[in-house]
């Protein structure tokens, strides 16, 4: 059974390996990219593990009173098991009552519905946000005023 924990610098090679496996077309981040980002202040990285093997990762960063959810990646064979939802909940808990912003692919309606369940509302379409001219939908959750859904 998988578990989620806060990532350490030692996890970054496994995170970069997953990134390369999942984002073959869209220009994956390198290990150096992850190391640089991880070292910045106000970063929050999580990993999902199954029997010691890292199977997914998520990240966020805080700037003033806003938290940006930046990454949420799970190996294909572990999807649809609630890992992404748990990543979201942990990052919302870390965000506290700050405003939370995220971007997701326009065609990823399943995840958009999950975000809506947790209080996110669409705010704008970001053309050419992802490689290969793929648009993103920006979604925002204003300052936390209610508890998270079960």
What do these predicted ranges mean?
Residues 2, 6, 10-77, 88-90, ...:
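Acetyl-CoA-dependent GNAT
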Residues 35-36, 108, 131-132:
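Short secondary-structure capping/turn micro-motifs that flank functional sites
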Residues 52, 56, 82-84, 119:
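Conserved phosphate-binding and hydrolysis motifs of nucleotide-dependent enzymes
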Residues 74, 80-93, 109, 113-117:
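Conserved acetyl-CoA-binding loop-helix of GNAT-fold acetyltransferases
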Residues 94-106:
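Conserved GNAT acetyl-CoA-binding A-motif
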Residues 101-104, 116, 121-138:
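Conserved catalytic-core motifs of GNAT/GCN5-like acyltransferases
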Residues 148-150:
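Intrinsically disordered, low-complexity acidic/proline-/asparagine-rich linker or regulatory tail/stalk regions
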């Amino acid at each position: 059974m998988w578990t989620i924990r806060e990532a350490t610098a030692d996890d970054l090679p496994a995170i970069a390996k997953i990134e390369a496996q999942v984002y073959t077309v869209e220009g994956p981040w390198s290990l150096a990219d992850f190391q640089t980002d991880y070292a910045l202040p106000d970063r929050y990285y999580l990993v999902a593990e199954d029997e010691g093997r890292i199977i997914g990762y998520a990240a966020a960063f805080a700037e003033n009173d806003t938290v940006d959810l930046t990454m949420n990646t799970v190996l294909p064979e572990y999807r649809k098991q609630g890992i992404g939802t748990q990543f979201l909940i942990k990052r919302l808990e870390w965000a506290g009552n700050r405003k939370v912003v995220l971007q997701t692919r326009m065609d990823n309606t399943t995840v958009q519905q999950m975000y809506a369940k947790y209080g996110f509302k669409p705010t704008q379409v970001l053309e050419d946000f992802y490689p290969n001219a793929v648009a993103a939908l920006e979604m925002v959750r204003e300052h936390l005023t209610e508890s998270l859904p079960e």
